[in-house]
């Protein structure tokens, strides 16, 4: 996917763009306890919401984590792109400070920033803009953002989720049910593809090792008898270079695997958004159910209630309490509460309807980004194999000549 994002509708004549690039990873404070890697972020844009047309800042991974937290907490109706796993050490030798790991993480962070830049809501967030251009990001977070995050407690969000975790929707709209199934099937397919590629990686690594072993044996054979009338040295070199080609192929296939894992995480974010949509609907349904109970109670009080024996009524008689006055006060209280609940239903329904519309837009954006990224990854995969087999063919043609 291109790092340059056109932010205009097709029908507009002007061209607004936002170009973000994460590049040049650099190890900082090496040898100390605070050793870390910083990444250069270059932003070019003509959007008026930015203070500069071009800016460069350096951010470490923990800064990206904080940005992710801010965007997620303050944009609950959006699919906020996921960050790569903090310790993504599969297929890595040398740990998180190895060049291989650092370069792979830089590519994943670049995809993360590009996804945010593509998003019609997130790219306008003042916090995202500050991340891209504010040289004092840590102070910005400490004094302007952290107090807001503290006021919107994560515990409250978890509590709301737990309250709705054991309740089911009375009737889920068909369109969102279809979306959920679509995402689930996509994640299932991606998971199967990931497993197949991991299997292929193991086979290619084994071939790399086997070609290296055969190359060594040919080298030993050549040293035993220099008079052999066969191009043993050429064969040995071709075998060795074939192993090297497999090593290069494995490295590039690992990058494809990173992309697939990243797209799978992105799909999971959409799945979580659909869950939050369900919570909004459950809020409305719970209020409607409570309103129905209050209406029944109001009607019961209005009709005079039960004419049978009532212990509370008998006690009120002994105390000389006016039953009609008590009934009117109860009726007034229930009507007041019912009015408040009806107002809450209207507000919750408005939030629910707006959330539904946002989910529709997020789903379309996700499909667009997913298709673009997968098409790019598959195209790269094909080109890598064309290059691989071309190089292998050329190697052995030279041996034959």
Curated annotation (Swiss-Prot):
KW Phosphoprotein (keyword) present: yes
Parts forming coiled coils: 190-292
One GO BP: reticulophagy
InterPro entries, sorted: AH/BAR_dom_sf, PX_dom, PX_dom_sf
Residues noted as binding a 1,2-diacyl-sn-glycero-3-phospho-(1D-myo-inositol-3-phosphate) in the record, renumbered to the chain: 60, 62, 86, 105
PX domain sequence ranges: 17-139
Topological type in the membrane: Peripheral membrane protein
CDD domains: PX_Atg24p (cd06863)
A cellular-component GO term for this protein: endosome membrane
UniProtKB keywords: Autophagy, Coiled coil, Cytoplasm, Endosome, Lipid-binding, Membrane, Phosphoprotein, Protein transport, Transport
GO molecular function: phosphatidylinositol-3-phosphate binding
Pfam family, one: PX
Sites bearing Phosphoserine, chain numbering: 62
UniProt free text on domains: The PX domain binds phosphatidylinositol 3-phosphate which is necessary for peripheral membrane localization to the perivacuolar punctate structures.
PANTHER family: SORTING NEXIN-4 (PTHR45949:SF4)
Family the UniProt entry places it in: Belongs to the sorting nexin family.
Role this protein plays: Sorting nexin, involved in the separation or division of vacuoles throughout the entire life cycle of the cells. Involved in retrieval of late-Golgi SNAREs from post-Golgi endosomes to the trans-Golgi network, for cytoplasm to vacuole transport (Cvt), and autophagy of large cargos including mitophagy, pexophagy and glycophagy.
Name under which the protein is recorded: Sorting nexin-4
Organism encoding this protein: Schizosaccharomyces pombe (strain 972 / ATCC 24843)
């Amino acid at each position: 996917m291109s790092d340059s994002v056109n932010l205009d509708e097709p029908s507009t004549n002007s061209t607004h763009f936002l170009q973000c690039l994460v590049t040049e990873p650099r190890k900082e404070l090496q040898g100390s306890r605070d050793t870390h890697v910083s990444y250069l972020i270059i932003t070019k844009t003509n959007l008026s919401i930015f203070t500069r047309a071009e800016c460069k800042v350096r951010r470490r991974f923990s800064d990206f984590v904080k940005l992710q937290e801010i965007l997620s907490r303050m944009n609950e109706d959006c699919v906020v792109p996921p960050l790569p796993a903090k310790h993504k050490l599969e297929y890595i030798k040398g740990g998180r400070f190895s060049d291989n790991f650092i370069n792979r993480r830089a590519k994943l962070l670049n995809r993360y920033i590009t996804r945010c830049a593509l998003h019609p809501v997130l790219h306008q967030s003042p916090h995202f803009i500050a991340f891209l251009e504010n040289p004092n990001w840590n102070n910005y977070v400490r004094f302007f953002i952290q107090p807001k995050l503290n006021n919107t407690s994560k515990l409250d969000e978890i509590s709301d989720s737990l309250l709705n975790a054991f309740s089911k929707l009375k009737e889920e709209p068909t369109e969102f049910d279809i979306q959920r199934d679509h995402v689930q099937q996509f994640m299932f397919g991606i998971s199967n593809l990931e497993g197949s590629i991991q299997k292929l990686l193991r086979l290619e690594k084994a071939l790399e090792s086997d070609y290296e072993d055969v190359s060594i044996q040919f080298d030993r054979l050549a040293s035993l008898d220099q008079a052999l009338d066969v191009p043993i040295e050429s064969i040995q070199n071709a075998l060795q270079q074939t192993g090297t080609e497999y090593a290069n192929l494995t490295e590039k296939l690992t990058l494809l695997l990173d992309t697939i894992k990243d797209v799978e995480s992105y799909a999971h974010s959409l799945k979580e958004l659909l869950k939050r949509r369900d919570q909004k609907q459950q809020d409305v349904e719970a209020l409607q159910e409570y309103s129905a109970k209050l209406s029944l109670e109001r009607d019961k009080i209005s009709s005079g209630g039960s004419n049978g024996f009532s212990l509370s009524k008998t006690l009120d008689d002994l105390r000389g309490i006016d039953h009609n006055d008590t009934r009117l006060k109860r009726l007034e209280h229930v009507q007041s509460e019912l009015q408040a609940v009806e107002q809450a239903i209207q507000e919750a329904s408005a939030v629910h309807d707006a959330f539904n519309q946002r989910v529709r837009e997020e789903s379309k954006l996700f499909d667009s980004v997913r298709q673009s990224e997968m098409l790019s990854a598959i195209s790269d995969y094909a080109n890598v194999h064309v290059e691989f087999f071309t190089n292998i063919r050329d190697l052995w043609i030279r041996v034959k000549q």
